[in-house]
Amino acid sequence: MQSFTDTPDFQLTTKNTPSVVMTSDLRKVYRTGFWMNQKVVSLKGCSLTVYQGETFGLLGPNGAGKTTLLKLLLGIIRPSGGKGLLLGQPLGDRHIKQRVGYLSENPYLYEYLTGWEFLELAAGLFEIPASVQRQRIPELLDLVGLSVADAQKKQMRRYSKGMLQRVGMAQALINDPELIFLDEPMSGLDPLGRYRMREIILSLKAAGKTIFFNSHILSEVEKICDRIAILSQGELVCSGSLDELLGSQNTYHVQGQNGDWEILKKWLANLVYEPDGYWQGTLQEDYYDFLASVRLMGGRIISMNLSRQSLEEFFINQIQKQDTSLHEVIDQSEV
């Protein structure tokens, strides 16, 4: 009997970098209603790969299926179809969980425990010896920027949101995991808290950890991630490196002088005419042909600067395309 890991489309490596997360046509359908005869499709055939040592961002609007995908990968819920591997083993493998860290969105932390006691509890679940705990816990507190005094003396009900998030991050790292899942790690944090969380994630990346997280704060994702995927309405809209996705729609801000105004309007968006024959606009076409056209009409280029769209602009564009496609399908089905 052939294992699904042997199939040609489900290999564990690409070039020289092994994958640590891989899914193929992963699906999740929930049953609802009094008789459990109604179906809600939460995830529709998701196929993606996360490689060792990279920081991977999962993006999508509310209700897109991001948390469902995380729970499937972690083995918290079972898939309705498809297949997946986590660190080379099928999803749900108990032994793999020893090598994984997880920070959920808005985690419940035992408020009458101190941060230190909570980390001892988390370490005990992994059967980490007390001697190792005494060394590991102070190291983690230092990493997440929480003082030993606060961790030992204050009950967590007296912690700020940022302090709770840092304790949550420390417990996700208590077992020194190879792969770390973070569900909205910057949710509810102020700018300073986001900065500190970003620095923690970057330090983990520098240490060779693989990080899989979802977030609505796209500016932070753009600073941190190597690759991203966008989910919308349970479907994987796109995935790839930021350079691949954002670089595919590069634009150029062009400033020049002289030339035929009507021809320039055909090439440039947002064209503005200025005194003494100067003009500026945005170019989204092949700039080689544009430069040749400017020379032929006697104009000159003063400057041309590459202006890559932001992740936020790309994200909104992709979601709007997905919504438009969905409405078109619905409209056609009603004809």
Swiss-Prot record:
<dbReference type="GO" id="GO:0016887">
    <property type="term" value="F:ATP hydrolysis activity"/>
</dbReference>
<keyword id="KW-0813">Transport</keyword>
<dbReference type="InterPro" id="IPR051782">
    <property type="entry name" value="ABC_Transporter_VariousFunc"/>
</dbReference>
<feature type="domain" description="ABC transporter">
    <location>
        <begin position="21"/>
        <end position="258"/>
    </location>
</feature>
<keyword id="KW-0067">ATP-binding</keyword>
<protein>
    <recommendedName>
        <fullName>Uncharacterized ABC transporter ATP-binding protein all4389</fullName>
    </recommendedName>
</protein>
<dbReference type="InterPro" id="IPR017871">
    <property type="entry name" value="ABC_transporter-like_CS"/>
</dbReference>
<dbReference type="InterPro" id="IPR003439">
    <property type="entry name" value="ABC_transporter-like_ATP-bd"/>
</dbReference>
<comment type="similarity">
    <text>Belongs to the ABC transporter superfamily.</text>
</comment>
<dbReference type="InterPro" id="IPR027417">
    <property type="entry name" value="P-loop_NTPase"/>
</dbReference>
<keyword id="KW-0547">Nucleotide-binding</keyword>
<dbReference type="GO" id="GO:0005524">
    <property type="term" value="F:ATP binding"/>
</dbReference>
<dbReference type="InterPro" id="IPR003593">
    <property type="entry name" value="AAA+_ATPase"/>
</dbReference>
<feature type="binding site">
    <location>
        <begin position="60"/>
        <end position="67"/>
    </location>
    <ligand>
        <name>ATP</name>
    </ligand>
</feature>
<dbReference type="Pfam" id="PF00005">
    <property type="entry name" value="ABC_tran"/>
</dbReference>
